[in-house]
């Protein structure tokens, strides 16, 4: 025997279609409001919320359970249907349903949906006419029952009364919003002007700093040029000094080994780096003084051995 699950499939299809309708409604609303959105993000958020509400409220399981009961009855298994019938006519079930209805009413009242609004929503529905701004007000079965029971009255005085929504002074609200907007606009302009002044001051300081940096760079360039010229002059002076000393050395009646030693010391002077050149000249002068001191001591000792005395004049 073929097992029928058409009712379950229909319920699942209705639930899935409801979810797709919720996604389409959300995206179309965002488009009408001119809000940029990511379809995948909207789809994920709506699915998460939809699944949570359907599961937490028990609506999905309730619908699928009823569909399974109908399919079982269609397949010749009436046990579940009989149990559901007995459960529905049980006094405890009726009391529980009545309690749930009362909870829902209190929840709606706490949300600001009073009895008048609940009754009107239950008695009437609005049908839009495509292509027109007007609508058709339809009476529900509850309204029909109230008419049959004589629970509907016509109050002519109610027409002249103003509804609560009509008592709102939209002009004063508009004026208040306009004042708030002007105040906000003034604050924004003040902040913008202050920011502009700060930006101008920063630019002035930046230009002043750039001028100072430019002047310092020019001074540094001049000093660098002067240092380069001084270094070149010192190199020329040291080179001239070495040449002059070499020429003077060759003109003196000194032993060749002494001349060679002094010439080697002169040639070892670093003529490129003035600092090193000064150190080399200092070392050469010390060596000459040391050699002169040794020569003087030798001459002094020789005079003493010869029983001669010496004196400075």
UniProtKB/Swiss-Prot annotation:
- Which Gene3D superfamilies does this one have? 3.30.70.1610, Nonstructural RNA-binding protein, Rotavirus non-structural protein NSP3, N-terminal domain
Positions in coiled-coil regions? 166-237
Q: Where in the cell is it found?
A: Host cytoplasm
Question: Per the record, which residues fall in region RNA-binding?
Answer: 1-149
A Pfam family recorded for this sequence: Rota_NSP3
Query: Which cellular component, as a GO term, is one annotated location?
Result: host cell cytoplasm
GO terms, biological process: regulation of translation
Keyword annotations of the record: Coiled coil, Host cytoplasm, Host-virus interaction, RNA-binding, Translation regulation
The annotated region (Interaction with host ZC3H7B) lies at 170-234
InterPro entries assigned: NSP3_N_rotavirus, NSP3_sf, Rotavirus_NSP3
Q: Where is this region: Interaction with host EIF4G1?
A: 208-313
Residues of the region (Dimerization) are: 150-206
Molecular-function annotations in GO: RNA binding
Q: What does this protein do?
A: Plays an important role in stimulating the translation of viral mRNAs. These mRNAs are capped but not polyadenylated, instead terminating in a conserved sequence 'GACC' at the 3' that is recognized by NSP3, which competes with host PABPC1 for EIF4G1 binding. The interaction between NSP3 and host EIF4G1 stabilizes the EIF4E-EIF4G1 interaction, thereby facilitating the initiation of capped mRNA translation.
Subunit and partners: Homodimer. Interacts (via the coiled-coil region) with host ZC3H7B (via LD motif). Interacts with host EIF4G1.
Which family does the record assign? Belongs to the rotavirus NSP3 family.
The name of this protein is Non-structural protein 3
Q: Which organism is it from?
A: Rotavirus A (strain RVA/Human/Japan/KU/1995/G1P1A[8]) (RV-A)
């Amino acid at each position: 025997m073929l097992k029928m699950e058409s009712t379950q499939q229909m319920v699942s299809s209705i639930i899935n279609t409801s979810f797709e309708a919720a996604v389409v409604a959300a995206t179309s609303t965002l488009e009408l409001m001119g809000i940029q959105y990511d379809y995948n993000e909207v789809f994920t958020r709506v699915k998460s919320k939809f699944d949570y509400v359907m599961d937490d409220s028990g609506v999905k399981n309730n619908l699928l359970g009823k569909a399974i009961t109908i399919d079982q009855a269609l397949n010749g298994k009436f046990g579940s249907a009989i149990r559901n019938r007995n459960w529905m006519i049980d006094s405890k079930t009726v009391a529980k349903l009545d309690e749930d209805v009362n909870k829902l009413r209190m929840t709606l009242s706490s949300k600001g949906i009073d009895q008048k609004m609940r009754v009107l929503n239950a008695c009437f529905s609005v049908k839009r006419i495509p292509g027109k701004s007007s609508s058709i007000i339809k009476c529900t079965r509850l309204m029909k029952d109230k008419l049959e029971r004589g629970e509907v009255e016509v109050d002519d005085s109610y027409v002249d009364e103003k509804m609560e929504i009509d008592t709102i002074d939209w002009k004063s609200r508009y004026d208040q919003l306009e004042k708030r907007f002007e105040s906000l606009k003034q604050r924004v302009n003040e902040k913008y002007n202050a920011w502009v002044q700060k930006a101008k001051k920063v630019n002035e300081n930046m230009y002043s700093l750039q001028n100072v940096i430019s002047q310092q760079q020019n001074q540094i360039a001049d000093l660098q040029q002067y240092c380069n010229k001084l270094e070149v002059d010192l190199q020329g002076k040291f080179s001239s000094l070495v040449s002059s000393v070499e020429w003077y050395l060759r003109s003196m009646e000194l032993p060749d080994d002494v001349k060679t030693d002094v010439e080697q010391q002169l040639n070892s002077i670093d003529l490129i780096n003035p600092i090193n050149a000064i150190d080399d000249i200092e070392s050469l002068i010390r060596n000459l003084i040391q050699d002169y001191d040794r020569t003087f001591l030798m001459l002094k000792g020789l005079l003493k051995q010869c029983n001669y005395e010496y004196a400075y004049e």
